[in-house]
Amino acid sequence: MEKVPMTTAGFESLKKELRWRQQEERPRIIEAISEARAHGDLSENAEYHAAKEAQSYNEGRINELEDYIARAEVINVSRLSGDKIKFGATIKLLDEDTEEKKVYQIVGDQEADVKTGKISISSPIARALIGKQEGDVIEVNAPGGAHNYEIIKVQYI
């Protein structure tokens, strides 16, 4: 079974979602199915079919979360240090083309959310950053074209 790197915060977030899906969402869906059944003919009962679809999605997500949690290699980022960029690093970059500054943290695939500055360890920009250090310049080939970034700061927070 292949281990999946994950920050402590990401691991706790997955456990929280799993608890919610098992303890709150599952009973709510079961109740919705029961109520829809009470309306009679199931072949044309849209509420019943919607509830069954929600149940299928929820159970699939529960299985997925259980798998991620079982395979998690939890890494406490605050205990990491060093000059070189690795999993868990928070990096401040300067886009040399636009002069725009960006801050990213390299996290596991399941935690990635570009809107909040969390990029997947398997993303093109993270792969370009791994092993680099402050002052280095990287080139990232993105869908919108190549970008050059200068690494301004590396932290483990």
From Swiss-Prot:
Signal peptide: none
One of the protein's GO biological processes: DNA-templated transcription elongation
Annotated InterPro entries: GreA/GreB_C_sf, TF_GreA/GreB_CS, Tscrpt_elong_fac_GreA, Tscrpt_elong_fac_GreA/B, Tscrpt_elong_fac_GreA/B_C, Tscrpt_elong_fac_GreA/B_fam, Tscrpt_elong_fac_GreA/B_N, Tscrpt_elong_fac_GreA/B_N_sf
Coiled coil: none
One protein family per Pfam: GreA_GreB
GO molecular function (one): DNA binding
Gene3D superfamilies, alphabetized: Transcription elongation factor, GreA/GreB, C-terminal domain, Transcription elongation factor, GreA/GreB, N-terminal domain
SUPFAM superfamilies reported for this sequence: FKBP-like, GreA transcript cleavage protein, N-terminal domain
UniProt KW keywords: DNA-binding, Transcription, Transcription regulation
Family classification: Belongs to the GreA/GreB family.
Xref: NCBIfam families: greA, PRK00226.1-2, PRK00226.1-4, PRK00226.1-5
UniProt function note: Necessary for efficient RNA polymerase transcription elongation past template-encoded arresting sites. The arresting sites in DNA have the property of trapping a certain fraction of elongating RNA polymerases that pass through, resulting in locked ternary complexes. Cleavage of the nascent transcript by cleavage factors such as GreA or GreB allows the resumption of elongation from the new 3'terminus. GreA releases sequences of 2 to 3 nucleotides.
Protein's UniProt name: Transcription elongation factor GreA
Species this chain originates from: Bartonella quintana (strain Toulouse) (Rochalimaea quintana)
Lineage of producing organism: Bacteria, Pseudomonadati, Pseudomonadota, Alphaproteobacteria, Hyphomicrobiales
